[in-house]
């Protein structure tokens, strides 16, 4: 650290108010400062690496040179506060507030039902708001692009995009690029034709209620900042922190002076590389140099032979500049510019593109850089400058590979980059493939350029660069050199492929894995470039250069990023229903406006408590080992550290129901909590946690996979089995028997709000108060009481809302609550425990990986006579919910099909992985994808469509399940029929077959899936519920119940129930929180039964109150509610009532293999259509149609939101979401960089949802629980992918490399799709013997 006399003041504005920081710390981010110092908690912490957009804010800067103000979005978690000198920051609180005025962006997001849990909502608001500040009349494409850097786990994005499109002059952009009318033109017709005897509605909100957007009313940029920017006497700024120094030079000479003095100090512009490296790789820099806003770094000159771009330009600014240049220059001059533009659209999200700079992108030379390969292929040069002078170097292979002779010298900086214009016979392309279309680092990317001799196809110069193949971007220079002088033809392509494989081959166990896939991508991307040049030559001279075959043209078409459209159809409310009765109406989420304004408080938004400490975890780095020692000395010596908590500090039991709070003597998985550190700040706690030294001694066996568990007979529970008919006998009397197995990998919950707990000890009576987001407060209370060795009545758990849960907050908060409570007990001080995203993923695990083995006997007609299923799930190291999950797997495994001879067996395997737990669908999404796999296999063997086999074997009449529960499948048949008809399945299937005949390298697939989904659990006492309703003397009502608001709209529906039962508007009703103090012994909110059971309890309480009020009402029937309440009080009538619902009487006798296991079923059907790129493995979801049996929907907006959100989450399970583990059991997917949930670009271009009416006398108001059912319908997407891949493989049928049966698995990632689409390029890839190397990652299912 330099020796400096003092620190300058940091000046910036937040929401129009001046902020002056006397001693700013360079290590403090804007997110931390907003939340902890300014108490602006609307900006959320969710990932900490700029990958989710929850912390999006708008930064505004004035440029003295251009005299313009620039507004741009940033992720506050990556922005050092020291970089904000002279800037204005706008947070969601500065946009609008319920207390003052709600902004149109916030209002429309809420009223369009674009919020569920609400944790991502402030970031969504800020992304759309920033777009409108720059483009008050945006296009739908701009709305979609603006949201590309924001993640939502609840809604499925459709209503969020729709809210943004309400600001567009023309919000409708038809996605139909094939025969057929626009979906929106058919909307009214569809609504009229579905159940013609019922009136159907298509509008979930009234756009006439929206307040108009008036750009003139937005806050002005602070004049003081303009004066600061134009000050001619600027000087260097120095900010001195606790450990680091920030130096902000005012001039270029000053920058070069600092660079010479501190050559190792990183230059901070956007902090998108250095910031994550500091946080996740433990890097430390005593000095930072930040040359923001230096005019010499912001030059832009497009005159002459190319474009000179200053290194300080953000990637967003670079994109704007290139768009302008491309529009002005002839196309043959802008080959490189257009290639860069194409990549910039999908590189990261808008926030990161607005922060990251061209200079930083070039200088870091990252292997996954999307721009450097293109810049190198385009013969770009770099202008370097230092105190010693200036020089230019080529951005070539030597530079990118890190050659000392070709890189930056000490003291140098990148001043600018020169991108030469291309010539007529030069062709440049950028190509990439990532796990998803946008906001994902490339698996492999490439920059390719060829210069041909004028008028010929002879190669004069060839440049091929690949990222993602080695530690740096690599050049195939040897191969390219050998091809100079050759003709651009098929023979050259074959030699190029062989040469590149030889020159750039990855070792078999290379970091990142996917070796064969990456090798294949190298050739596939080269082939795409080859075709593109062939096509361009034919356009230059059709007589001389033949065009590529018509069926090959699809290889040149990138999947577009469309704007989703769709319809939502539901039953209208009976016109005779009283107007004040909200049941059946699409009512906005009761906290929607609070979500959108950032005023909805989550646990970490609660104000700091006096003497509060922060907790950080130390987790095991071994999968199975003995703990030899824990050395806490160095950690305890650090400033601010109060205590290190271990198993020895647990006053009560350290092991409850098999769950271990703090590891004791041994660890049983990577990620198990060994100890925690309590300190005065989170930064101090985390730093100290990294200093704790744990010595281990490995224990064998180390069991990671299901196969290993089977080998060691390692199980968590006994086998569960159901059987009907005579399976073995039936196999002897069928035409054909097939066998197979399907691996279904796990899934991370990725709730936006990580596990968060505030534990506050009370001085009296050993009481402890916990605030947390959970689905099961009673369970937390039980675990904390056990750990502290106190009665449960001393533990109070308060739960207002959770930022998403999906099953991940049923059991895990109990474990973590006990950990936090023990720390609070030891220190005697409040403990705030907020898991980092990576720690959350590591510790809490997720959906169970599953191995399914099937044996199916069927007739030539496709009729299935016998099925034998074996399921194994990877339960992890402790019981958790694995027993219940495997029971669900077995009970739900028949799905919608009647198989007369059916047997299913299941076991939960014990492994040395973190314990997997409940997840939306509870085993059904894993098990039934195996069922659909064998349905597809049977269809293939019978030369039938899978849909024909499904329909043939579907339940058709009132029946009983394999476990002898009776049901009527009429709604199932109706959903199937309606979906078949209204999705135009057969017409589209024929069109897809025509498309596939005409397209070699892209294939289209369709699939339609039926569903019979169970609601509730087979244990009766888990269906009980209670409520507490108070009526106050002013007529207002306080409602409390035992259910937890997780974003599913439970509180909204409970208010609708209370409103109907009490006959008052919902405005009279307030619902504050769920608490063990008000409603004791409440069961978990899960299994889609929250509304069913809590609604009955609320109804019971309200009916009790209304019965008490009846004498008063009869005497004054025309009186007002307030008058009745006042009179009741005067007559000493109790205005408080508890409500209780005993529950559904379900049971399951596993010894007899029979029972009425579930209260009722939800039925549905979904049709999905996808395009698959056979060369890259990418896929595009074109359309999805969902028909869901909703019975009578209490709130169609909430129910449709649940269906859409579950469908997209299911789609993620089956496509983009891939958990990778090392052979030693370490989770490699720990954050947004490594784990990819769907973004706005993955959802269907056409998304249609119809609620099908039926009757359900079991549930309140004849409704049905719809929180989970849509999850499995996402499997229609993977089934459509299988269909498209089968079409690709059909063209290679008979080839030795193409087995007759496609071995399917989930997820269908780009890797699986590409390698399944076997072709001449996959045939060229060398296969390494698995026994000769250790793989980077393994399949644990």
From Swiss-Prot:
Function as written in the Swiss-Prot or TrEMBL entry: Aldehyde oxidase able to catalyze the oxidation of retinaldehyde into retinoate. Acts as a negative modulator of the epidermal trophism. May be able to oxidize a wide variety of aldehydes into their corresponding carboxylates and to hydroxylate azaheterocycles.
Misc remark: AOX genes evolved from a xanthine oxidoreductase ancestral precursor via a series of gene duplication and suppression/deletion events. Different animal species contain a different complement of AOX genes encoding an equivalent number of AOX isoenzymes. In mammals, the two extremes are represented by certain rodents such as mice and rats, which are endowed with 4 AOX genes, and by humans, whose genome is characterized by a single active gene.
Positions bound to FAD: 267-274, 348, 357, 361, 370, 414
Stored NCBIfam families: mam_aldehyde_ox (TIGR02969)
Annotated protein name in UniProt: Aldehyde oxidase 4
Gene of this entry: AOX4
Cytoplasm recorded as keyword: yes
Tissue expression from the record: Detected in liver, testis, kidney, brain, Harderian gland and olfactory mucosa.
Biological classification of the source: Eukaryota, Metazoa, Chordata, Craniata, Vertebrata
């Amino acid at each position: 650290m330099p020796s400096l006399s003092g620190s300058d003041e940091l000046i910036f504005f937040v929401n129009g108010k001046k902020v002056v920081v006397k001693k700013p710390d360079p290590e403090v981010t804007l997110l931390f400062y907003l939340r902890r110092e300014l108490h602006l908690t609307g900006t959320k912490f969710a990932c900490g690496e700029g990958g989710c957009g929850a912390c999006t804010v708008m930064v505004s800067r004035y440029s003295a040179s251009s005299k313009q103000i620039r507004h741009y979005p940033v992720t506050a978690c990556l922005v050092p506060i020291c970089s904000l000198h002279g800037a204005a920051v706008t947070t969601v609180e500065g946009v609008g507030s319920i207390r003052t005025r709600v902004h149109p962006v916030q209002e429309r997001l809420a009223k369009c039902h674009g919020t569920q849990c609400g944790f991502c909502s402030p970031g969504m608001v800020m992304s759309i708001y920033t777009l409108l500040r720059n483009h008050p009349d945006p296009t739908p494409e701009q709305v979609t692009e603006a949201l590309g850097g924001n993640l939502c786990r609840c809604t499925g994005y459709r209503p969020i995009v729709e809210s943004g499109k309400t600001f567009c002059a023309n919000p409708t952009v038809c996605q139909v690029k094939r025969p057929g009318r626009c979906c929106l033109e058919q909307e009214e017709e569809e609504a009229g034709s579905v159940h013609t005897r019922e009136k159907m509605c298509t509008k979930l909100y009234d756009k006439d209620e929206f307040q108009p957007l008036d750009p003139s009313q937005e806050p002005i940029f602070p004049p003081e900042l303009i004066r600061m920017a134009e000050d001619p006497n600027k000087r260097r700024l120095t900010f001195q922190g606790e450990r680091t120094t920030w130096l902000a030079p005012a001039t270029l000479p000053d920058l070069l002076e600092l660079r010479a003095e501190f050559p190792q100090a990183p230059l901070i512009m956007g902090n998108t590389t250095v910031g994550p490296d500091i946080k996740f790789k433990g890097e430390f820099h005593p000095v930072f140099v930040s040359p923001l806003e230096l005019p010499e770094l912001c030059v832009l000159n497009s005159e002459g032979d190319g474009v000179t771009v200053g290194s300080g330009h953000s990637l967003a600014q670079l994109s704007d500049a290139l768009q302008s240049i491309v529009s002005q220059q002839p196309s043959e001059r802008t080959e490189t510019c257009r290639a860069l533009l194409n990549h910039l659209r999908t590189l990261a999200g808008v926030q990161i593109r607005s922060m990251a700079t061209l200079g930083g992108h070039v200088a870091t030379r990252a292997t996954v850089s999307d721009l450097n390969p293109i810049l190198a292929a385009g013969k770009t040069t770099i202008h370097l400058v230092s105190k010693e002078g200036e020089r230019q170097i080529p951005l070539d292979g030597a530079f990118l590979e890190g050659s000392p002779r070709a890189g930056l010298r000490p003291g140098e900086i990148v001043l600018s980059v020169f991108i030469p214009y291309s010539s007529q016979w030069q062709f440049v392309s950028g190509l990439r493939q990532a796990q998803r279309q946008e906001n994902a680092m490339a698996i492999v990317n490439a920059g390719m350029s060829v210069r041909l001799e004028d008028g010929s196809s002879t190669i004069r110069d060839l440049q091929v660069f690949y990222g993602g193949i080695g530690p740096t971007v690599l050049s195939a220079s040897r191969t390219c050199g050998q091809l100079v002088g050759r003709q651009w033809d098929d023979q050259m392509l074959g030699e190029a492929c062989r040469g590149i494989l030889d020159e750039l081959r990855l070792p078999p166990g290379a970091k990142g894995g996917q070796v064969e896939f990456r090798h294949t991508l190298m050739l596939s991307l080269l082939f795409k470039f080859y075709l593109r040049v062939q096509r361009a030559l034919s356009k230059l001279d059709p007589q001389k250069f033949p065009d590529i075959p018509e069926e090959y043209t699809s290889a040149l078409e990138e999947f577009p990023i469309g704007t989703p459209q769709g319809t939502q159809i539901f039953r209208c409310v009976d016109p005779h229903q009283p107007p004040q009765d909200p049941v059946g109406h699409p009512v906005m989420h009761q906290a929607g406006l609070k979500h959108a304004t950032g005023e909805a408080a989550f646990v970490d938004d609660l104000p700091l408590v006096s003497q509060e400490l922060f907790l950080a975890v130390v987790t095991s780095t071994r999968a199975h080992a003995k703990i030899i020692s824990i050395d806490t000395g160095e950690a305890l010596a650090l400033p601010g550290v109060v205590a290190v908590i271990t198993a020895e500090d647990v006053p009560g039991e350290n092991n409850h129901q098999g769950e271990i709070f703090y590891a004791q003597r041994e660890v049983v998985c990577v990620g198990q909590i060994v100890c925690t550190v309590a300190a005065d700040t989170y930064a101090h706690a985390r730093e100290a946690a990294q200093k704790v030294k744990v010595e281990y001694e490995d224990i064998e066996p180390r069991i990671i996979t299901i196969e290993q568990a089977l080998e060691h007979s390692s199980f968590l529970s006994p086998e569960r089995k159901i059987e009907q008919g005579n399976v073995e006998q039936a196999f002897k009397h069928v035409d054909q028997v097939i066998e197979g197995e399907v691996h279904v990998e796990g899934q991370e919950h990725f709730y936006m709000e990580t596990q968060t707990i505030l534990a506050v000890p009370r001085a009296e009576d050993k009481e402890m108060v916990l605030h947390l987001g959970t689905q099961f407060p009673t369970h937390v209370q039980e675990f904390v009481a056990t750990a502290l060795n106190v009665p449960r009545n001393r533990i109070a758990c308060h739960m207002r809302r959770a930022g998403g849960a999906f099953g991940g907050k049923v059991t895990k908060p109990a474990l973590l609550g006990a950990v936090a409570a023990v720390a609070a007990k030891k220190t005697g001080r409040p403990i705030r425990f907020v898991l980092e995203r990576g720690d959350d993923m590591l510790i809490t695990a997720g959906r169970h990986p599953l191995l399914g083995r099937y044996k199916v006997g069927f007739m030539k007609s496709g009729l299935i006579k016998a099925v034998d299923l074996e399921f194994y799930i990877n339960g992890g190291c402790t019981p958790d919910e694995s027993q219940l999950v495997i029971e669900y797997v077995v009970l739900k495994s028949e799905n919608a099909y009647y198989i007369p001879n059916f047997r299913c067996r299941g076991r939960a395997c014990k492994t040395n992985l973190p314990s997997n737990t409940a997840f939306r669908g509870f085993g059904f999404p894993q098990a039934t994808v195996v069922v659909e796999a064998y349905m597809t296999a049977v269809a293939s063997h019978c030369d039938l469509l899978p849909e024909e086999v499904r329909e043939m074997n579907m339940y058709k009449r009132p029946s009983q399940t394999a476990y002898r529960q009776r049901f009527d499948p009429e709604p199932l048949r109706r959903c199937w029929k309606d979906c078949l008809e209204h999705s135009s399945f057969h017409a589209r299937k024929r069109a897809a077959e025509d498309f596939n005949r005409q397209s070699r390298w892209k294939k289209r697939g369709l699939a339609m899936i039926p569903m019979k989904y169970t609601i509730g659990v087979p244990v009766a006492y888990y269906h009980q519920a209670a409520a507490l309703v108070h009526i106050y003397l002013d007529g207002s009502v306080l409602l409390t119940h035992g259910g937890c608001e997780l974003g599913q709209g439970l509180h909204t529906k409970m208010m609708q129930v209370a409103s109907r039962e009490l006959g008052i508007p919902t405005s009279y009703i307030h619902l504050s929180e769920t608490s063990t103090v008000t409603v004791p012994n409440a069961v978990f909110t899960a299994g889609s039964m929250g509304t069913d059971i809590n609604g009955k309890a609320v109804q019971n309480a309200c009916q009790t109150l209304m019965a008490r009020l009846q004498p008063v009402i009869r005497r004054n029937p025309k009186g007002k509610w307030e008058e009745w309440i006042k009179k009741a009080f005067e007559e000493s009538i109790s205005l408080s009532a508890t409500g209780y619902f005993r529950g559904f009487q379900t049971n399951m006798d596993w010894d007899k293999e029979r029972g009425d296991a579930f209260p009722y079923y939800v039925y549905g059907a979904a049709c999905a259509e996808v395009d698959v790129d056979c060369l890259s493995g990418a896929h595009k979801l074109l359309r999805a149609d969902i028909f869901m049996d909703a019975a009578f929907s209490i709130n169609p907006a909430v129910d449709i939101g649940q269906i859409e959100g579950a469908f997209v989450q299911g789609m993620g399970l089956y496509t983009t979401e891939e958990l990778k583990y090392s052979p030693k059991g370490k989770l490699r997917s720990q954050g947004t960089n490594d784990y990819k949930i769907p973004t706005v670009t993955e959802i269907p271009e056409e998304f249609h949802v119809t609620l099908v009416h039926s009757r359900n006398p079991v549930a309140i108001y004849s409704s049905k629980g719809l929180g989970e059912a849509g999850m499995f319908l996402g499997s229609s997407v993977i089934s459509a992918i299988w269909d498209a891949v089968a079409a690709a493989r059909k063209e290679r049928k008979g080839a030795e490399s193409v087995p007759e049966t496609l071995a399917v698995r989930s997820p269908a990632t780009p890797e699986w799709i590409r390698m399944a689409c076997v072709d001449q390029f996959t045939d060229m890839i060398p296969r390494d013997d698995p026994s000769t190397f250790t793989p980077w990652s393994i399949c644990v299912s």
